[in-house]
Amino acid sequence: MKFIIKLFPEITIKSQSVRLRFIKILTTNIRNVLKHLEDDTLAIVRHWDHIELRTKDGNLGPEICDALTRIPGIHHILEVEDRSYSDMHNIFEQTLEAYRETLVGKTFCVRVKRRGKHEFSSGDVERYVGGGLNQHIESAKVNLTRPQVTVNLEVDQDKLILVKARHEGLGGFPIGTQEDVLSLISGGFDSGVSSYMLMRRGCRVHYCFFNLGGSAHEIGVKQVAHYLWNRFGSSHRVRFIAIDFEPVVGEILEKVEDGQMGVVLKRMMVRAASQVAERYGVQALVTGEALGQVSSQTLTNLRLIDNASDTLILRPLISHDKEHIINLARQIGTEDFAKTMPEYCGVISKSPTVKAVKAKIEEEESHFDFSILDRVVSEAKNVDIREIAQQSREQVVEVETVAELADTDVLLDIRAPDEQEEKPLKLDQVEVRSLPFYKLSSQFADLDQSKTYLLYCDRGVMSRLQALYLREQGYTNVKVYRP
């Protein structure tokens, strides 16, 4: 079985030295991706305008073809069969044998590519073979503009190459031809698509996740990152860095004015990610921000977010609308992950600014204890992406959700103080206590552990994440309250 791998057109217009480097990297990437097949008969040979792949194990054909369609740098893949030929009539006879059943009742055209010196041209072969097929298959008709079947042939010196199938590739540049980037991934639609777009452009994409509460969300995001890597970037080893950002969020909620919280949080994330990028020699950050999508993504606010660090920030989705982003997520397979990913509800301003003022932002940040940011970055967890598959299979501790309260239960309102003031929680015959989520990890141990505590927040997301975290710490007296 033989495959001819055609290069992405942008590769073919590079200078000779760059083109050779790109082809060499693409060949190495293909070998790395197919290494798990353990096929001793697999042979990959690079040429000036294509890469040739052969295997004697025909059963591996579908798996090889599927893998090739997901490797950046490949324009299309031709599944071919090599034959020898004697003359133009012999080419027609072999084509008729191969395509007779396929062309019954169909419109068709013949397309020929030729390399070498011959007594005939490509057009001569197209006319001769096409006319012969039209005469010998009565129900078939020639259609040169919109054929149902295109008969693709290649004549290479003394070989006839019958193209049995054509499969579209991913396009783009081979991973490793551009420098590394660090994607700020949240598991939603935007960050997954932006990560994919940079992989397709030839970057090795590492992942940085800011954990805003509990392991359930982290495991979900790890699964998204592993899926993207396994599907499009498994030719290279990458890092997954998880940063516990809950202490930073708590400091923002206590020290920063409501309207400035969103921009300040993004600036803190950029600062933290920049430190991580510098640590690992990564050249740029990648975010899924789109212009005007939310309040922090206006031009004014994006400029202020950029000013928090000297590191280059790439935003491949900046001009894309949400519908287009969701369609892209559907195409690459991350839509289902994104739809079920919990959205963090801890830092939601009642009146977020859409045109932040630099002096005001800097004044608010002057109240922030930056030693907290330095600490969470220094404690960041660095995981090899290949280890995530095993970690993701581990059971997540289940937390019971209740809709009714017992007299002995204590309800913990874990919302931020301003949310509690705006929508006070009043329940008869049940003790209600206020303990913002960002204080749970440090103050829950001080509570009476003989009682059962029900955690409450508006959406039920933060309460579940915090309950999971407490269960992992060994506390069994926690549940989630969802009326």
Swiss-Prot record:
Residue ranges of domain Rhodanese in the record: 405-483
Pfam families xrefs: Rhodanese, ThiI, ThiI_fer, THUMP
UniProt cross-references to HAMAP family, sorted A to Z: ThiI
An example Gene Ontology biological process: thiamine biosynthetic process
Stated name of the protein: tRNA sulfurtransferase
Family annotation (SMART domains): THUMP (SM00981)
Enzyme class of the recorded protein, top EC level: transferase
UniProt: ATP binding residues: 184-185, 266, 288, 297
Keywords assigned by UniProt, alphabetized: ATP-binding, Cytoplasm, Disulfide bond, Nucleotide-binding, Redox-active center, RNA-binding, Thiamine biosynthesis, Transferase, tRNA-binding
First-listed, main subcellular location of the protein, grouped into a coarse class: cytoplasm
